C-alpha cells in the first residue's frame, strides 16, 4: 500500500500483482474479472464533489468505497491513509496519491500519511541515512500540497510503538503459507521482509485503533494484494460474524441468494405460506430450474441437497451471529442485547427480529465494549499509472521518464519539451487524421496534473488533439510553461513547509545504523 519510486507492476493479463515489482497494466478491465476490483464509475454519482481524478476516470476502480462515500454524505467519521516508501525523490506520480489523500482530508476524513521506512530498509535494502533524507522530501511535498498536519497524522513505521504492537497482534492471524500464496515468498525470503508486510497491514488498520470507521487506502493496482490481505485480517480479528440464515443448516455466501429466492416464492409451493418447509423448497427448486438462472449447477445442486436434508424444518429468515473469538463475557453480553425472539446454540445465536444492518451494528458495539478492535474492512481506490515521458514506464531510475517534485522549473519544462507524444509523423498528417491523446504522455500531464480542477482545459486539449487542431509543438510548449509554473510554486511552498515540519513530532534523524 505504499508508493515508491518505481511505479512498476506486472500486468493483469499475467494474473499477478506484485507490490515490489514493475508497474505496467496492459488492460485495466482485466482487474475487474481477475481480482474483483469494481469500476469506480459505478459509485461516482454517490461521491460529494468528486476529485478531478475521479471525474476523469484516472481513478478507475475501488473496493468497498460505497461505505466511505456514504460517510462523506452523512457527515460521519471516516479516514484515509497512504504510505510512501522513501527510496528516491518524490515525483509527479506520487503527487497523484498526495492529492487523493489531501482531498479526502478536505472532505472531512481523518488523514494519515506514513513513511514506510521499515519496508524500505527490509524490501529495498536502503540504509537509514538515505531513508531519512528521502523521508523529509516526501513530507515537505505532502505539506506543500496542502496536507493539514494539525488535523492529520504523520508517522514513521520505525518509531510508532502502537503500530508495532498492532502488527504483532495481526501477525498471530497470518501464516507463511499465505505469504507464499499472496506474494510468492519462499524459503529465501528474509523474515524482516515478511515482518514489513504485517507492519503494512497494521498501517492500513491503524486509523481504526481509536474507533472503528470506514477507511480508504488510495493506491495503484499493484498494491491490491496488500488491500485484500488487510481486509482478510480485519475480518479474522472480529469477535462475531453476522450472516443471513434460513434454517439450522448453514448456507454458503453464494447459496443464500437462491435460498432467499425460494423463500420469497413460497406461495407457489408451500402448504402453509407462514411456515414453508425446507423439503417443499427443495422440491420446488428441483422442479423449477428457471429459479436458478444465473446460479452455477453445482451451487444449485448443493442448495437442493441441503434443503432436502433439513426435511420438515421450517424455512424461516433470521440473522445468525457466529462466535469467532469473542470472550465469554462478550458472547453473553451479545445474547443479552439481542431483542425479540432468539435461539442460542453452542457457538452461535439466531435472531428472528433483527435486520442484518442492525445485527452488524449490535455485534460491532458489543465487540468494542468488550475490548475488541471491531475493524471495518478497509476500502480502496485505484488509479491508473502515469506513462513515463519517454513512453514506457515511469521510474526514478530513469530521470528522463519522470519529473521530480524537486526538479528546478527549467529542468521540468525541458523534460516536457523532450517528451514522447501521441502525434502523427508530420503536421499535415496530424491536421488530417488528428493526434492520439489516449497514447500521449503529454496529454496525461494535462489530465493528471496540469489542468488541475479545470475539466474544460483537459477536455479542450483532448478534443483539439484528436480532431487535428492542436499540434504537438504548441501543446508541449503550453504544458512546459504550466509545469514550470507548478514546480516554481511547489518548491516555494516546500520551503515554507520546512518550519511546519520542524514543529511536528516526527524524527527525521534515525538513531538506527
Swiss-Prot record:
Q: Where in the cell is it found?
A: Cytoplasm
What is the residue range of the motif 'KMSKS' region? 393-397
Say which domain of life the source belongs to.
Archaea
Instruction: Cite the Gene3D superfamilies for this sequence.
Output: HUPs, Tyrosyl-Transfer RNA Synthetase
Q: Would the keyword Transmembrane helix be found if you checked this record's keyword annotation?
A: no
Q: Where is the signal peptide?
A: none
Which GO CC terms are listed, alphabetically? cytoplasm
According to its UniProt entry, the protein's GO biological process terms are: tryptophanyl-tRNA aminoacylation
Query: What InterPro entries does UniProt report for this protein, alphabetically?
Result: aa-tRNA-synth_Ic, Rossmann-like_a/b/a_fold, Trp-tRNA-ligase, Tryptophan-tRNA-ligase_arc
HAMAP family tied to this protein: Trp_tRNA_synth_A (MF_00140_A)
Member of which family?
Belongs to the class-I aminoacyl-tRNA synthetase family.
Q: Per its record, how is this protein called by name?
A: Tryptophan--tRNA ligase 1
Amino acid at each position: 500500500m505504499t508508493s515508491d519510486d518505481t511505479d512498476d507492476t506486472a500486468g493483469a493479463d499475467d494474473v499477478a500483482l506484485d507490490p515490489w515489482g514493475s508497474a505496467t497494466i496492459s488492460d485495466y478491465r482485466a482487474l475487474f474479472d481477475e481480482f474483483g476490483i469494481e469500476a469506480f464509475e459505478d459509485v461516482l454519482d454517490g461521491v460529494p464533489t468528486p476529485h478531478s481524478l475521479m471525474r476523469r476516470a484516472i481513478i478507475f476502480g475501488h473496493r468497498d468505497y460505497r461505505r466511505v462515500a456514504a460517510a462523506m454524505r452523512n457527515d460521519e467519521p471516516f479516514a484515509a491513509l497512504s504510505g510512501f516508501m522513501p527510496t528516491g525523490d518524490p515525483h509527479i506520480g506520487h503527487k497523484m496519491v498526495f492529492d487523493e489523500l489531501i482531498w479526502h482530508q478536505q472532505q472531512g476524513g481523518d488523514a494519515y500519511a506514513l513513511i514506510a521506512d521499515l519496508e524500505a530498509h527490509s524490501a529495498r535494502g536502503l540504509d537509514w541515512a538515505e531513508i531519512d533524507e528521502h523521508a523529509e522530501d516526501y513530507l515537505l511535498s505532502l505539506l506543500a500540497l496542502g496536507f493539514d498536519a494539525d488535523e492529520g497524522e504523520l508517522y514513521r513505521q520505525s518509531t510508532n510503538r502502537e503500530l508495532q504492537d498492532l502488527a504483532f497482534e495481526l501477525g498471530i492471524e497470518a501464516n507463511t503459507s499465505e505469504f507464499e500464496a499472496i506474494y510468492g515468498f519462499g524459503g529465501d525470503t528474509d523474515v524482516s521482509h515478511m515482518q514489513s508486510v504485517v507492519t503494512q497491514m497494521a498501517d492500513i488498520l491503524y486509523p481504526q485503533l481509536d474507533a472503528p470507521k470506514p477507511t480508504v487506502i488510495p493506491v495503484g493496482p499493484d498494491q491490491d494484494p496488500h488491500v485484500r490481505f488487510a481486509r482478510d485480517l480485519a475480518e479474522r480479528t472480529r469477535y462475531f460474524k453476522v450472516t443471513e440464515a434460513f434454517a439450522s443448516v448453514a448456507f454458503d455466501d453464494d447459496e443464500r441468494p437462491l435460498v432467499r429466492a425460494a423463500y420469497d416464492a413460497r406461495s407457489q409451493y408451500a402448504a402453509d405460506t407462514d411456515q414453508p418447509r425446507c423439503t417443499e423448497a427443495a422440491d420446488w427448486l428441483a422442479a423449477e430450474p428457471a429459479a436458478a438462472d444465473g446460479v452455477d449447477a453445482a451451487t444449485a445442486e448443493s442448495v437442493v441437497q441441503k434443503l432436502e436434508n433439513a426435511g420438515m424444518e421450517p424455512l424461516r429468515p433470521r440473522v445468525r451471529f457466529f462466535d469467532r473469538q469473542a470472550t465469554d463475557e462478550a458472547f453473553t453480553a451479545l445474547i443479552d442485547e439481542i431483542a425479540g425472539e432468539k435461539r442460542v446454540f453452542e457457538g452461535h445465536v439466531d435472531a428472528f427480529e433483527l435486520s442484518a444492518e442492525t445485527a452488524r451494528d449490535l455485534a460491532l458495539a458489543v465487540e468494542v465494549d468488550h475490548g475488541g478492535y471491531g475493524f471495518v474492512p478497509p476500502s480502496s481506490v485505484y488509479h491508473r499509472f502515469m506513462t513515463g515521458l519517454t513512453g514506457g514506464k515511469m521510474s526514478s531510475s530513469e530521470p528522463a521518464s519522470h519529473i521530480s517534485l524537486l526538479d528546478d522549473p527549467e529542468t521540468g519544462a525541458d523534460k516536457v519539451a523532450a517528451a514522447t507524444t501521441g502525434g502523427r509523423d508530420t503536421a499535415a498528417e496530424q491536421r488530417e487524421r488528428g493526434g492520439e491523446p489516449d497514447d500521449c504522455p503529454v496529454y496525461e500531464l494535462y489530465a493528471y496534473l496540469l489542468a488541475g480542477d479545470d475539466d474544460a482545459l483537459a477536455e479542450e486539449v483532448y478534443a483539439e488533439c484528436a480532431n487535428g487542431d492542436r499540434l504537438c509543438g504548441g501543446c508541449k510548449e503550453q504544458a512546459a510553461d504550466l509545469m514550470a509554473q507548478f514546480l516554481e510554486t511547489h518548491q516555494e511552498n516546500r520551503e515554507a513547509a520546512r518550519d511546519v515540519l520542524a514543529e511536528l513530532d516526527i524524527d527525521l534523524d534515525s538513531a538506527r545504523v
